[in-house]
Amino acid sequence: MSTHYIAGQWLAGQGETLESLDPVGQGVVWSGRGADATQVDAAVCAAREAFPAWARRPLEQRIELLERFAATLKSRADELARVIGEETGKPLWESATEVTSMVNKVAISVQAFRERTGEKSGPLADATAVLRHKPHGVVAVFGPYNFPGHLPNGHIVPALLAGNCVVFKPSELTPKVAELTLKAWIQAGLPAGVLNLVQGGRETGVALAAHRGLDGLFFTGSSRTGNLLHSQFGGQPQKILALEMGGNNPLVVEEVADLDAAVYTIIQSAFISAGQRCTCARRLLVPQGAWGDALLARLVAVSATLRVGRFDEQPAPFMGAVISLSAAEHLLKAQEHLIGKGAQPLLAMTQPIDGAALLTPGILDVSAVAERPDEEFFGPLLQVIRYSDFAAAIREANATQYGLAAGLLSDSRERFEQFLVESRAGIVNWNKQLTGAASSAPFGGIGASGNHRPSAYYAADYCAYPVASLESPSVSLPATLTPGISL
């Protein structure tokens, strides 16, 4: 089966056998063989060969091609949404919004490139000072499984726009989405070698990340893998490394007038996408006392009624499956471990169908747990921590190596301004779901959550480097020579 796209040709893999499975029914969605080191090398070489012509292509022509890609995505939106749902387990309504985000990424990237890069000039003494931006060359893009279309797209589109050529390695759990996305690029007329696809797991990823022909690597995924890449790229300052990783995100709740609005916002923050967004709330900080008790009682009651089901079920579920049976098992074991350390299950996470990666929402009160693990449990498992006062809430919110997202539900603007200053996160929301983000704003965090701001408006910053020039049409003597020189 031809599963890799290298130098404008579809090729069969020569590496390990791969399958992607429907997370609910466990049927085979895609099968093939991964790319081995030789094929990875061929992909990097193809990108290097294509780079000079692509980088010299006028910006407006590159934009035209990207706009044709967006139009192709629109024309194939239903097909792509279904494949995303089938392979990830997320409901069709959510898959459709992902495709829309992929389409919109083109216009956002063009706007960002024009505003944040491009060319600027001005007079400086007897010369002209010019600022330009140039592409790095050949970059690798590693994609995650939770948004297998949108998140890699957030690297690939700005990278190509800036004039780079790309070798794309998607998650081994979502190869079919990647294959269909590549076909949309091909339909849009992308030249051979400009974007190459190598499918595979660890073997393929290690070969690509270690390739000496790369000028950079853009990654969205787990902190564990991101840390490995960071170590691997250590001592290579000549290469650009952009990492967007996870978070142990806190959502602090104060007593608010509209309790149901707070409950809805918490659910959207913690359980959207079955908890498989890097900005999902992992820790819910609730005040001690009667109001906090009432909030949790209502949260548990509503969460217990959330519809969970297959991606194409009707009526549509709120939550689909997590990505795989192994992911579901890991989450259930994490819940068991926390309960064993003293956590109180307010709503136990369950697996309603044996052999399916469907999970119901889980809510644990971990206030009494000593040495709580600072870990991102990537699924519908929410930890509740009761706090005594706002200062204690902020201390608890910041008690993490991560720094991706933090949120506050409060009727007090003064409280939010304090939270904004004292919290440690790249995204800080007030009375909005933690998973909400503006495409015109930077997306990313600090600490173990990564560097740079991939997948959003600021992606232009790491896809091209600035070049400063002093220019004059001819060589001429200055009006006054430097002391000690005579001509």
From Swiss-Prot:
In which residues is NAD(+) bound?
221-226
The answer on whether this UniProt entry bears the keyword Oxidoreductase reads yes
Keywords linked to the UniProt accession: Arginine metabolism, NAD, Oxidoreductase
A Gene Ontology biological process noted in the UniProt record is: arginine catabolic process to succinate
Can you tell me which residues form the catalytic site?
244, 278
Instruction: Give one GO term, molecular function aspect.
Output: succinylglutamate-semialdehyde dehydrogenase activity
**Gene3D superfamilies attached to this UniProt entry:** Aldehyde Dehydrogenase, Chain A, domain 1, Aldehyde Dehydrogenase, Chain A, domain 2
Catalysis performed (reactions)? N-succinyl-L-glutamate 5-semialdehyde + NAD(+) + H2O = N-succinyl-L-glutamate + NADH + 2 H(+)
Listed EC numbers: 1.2.1.71
Name what induces it. Answer: By arginine, under the control of ArgR.
| Secretion signal span | none
Q: What does this protein do?
A: Catalyzes the NAD-dependent reduction of succinylglutamate semialdehyde into succinylglutamate.
**Protein name (database record):** N-succinylglutamate 5-semialdehyde dehydrogenase
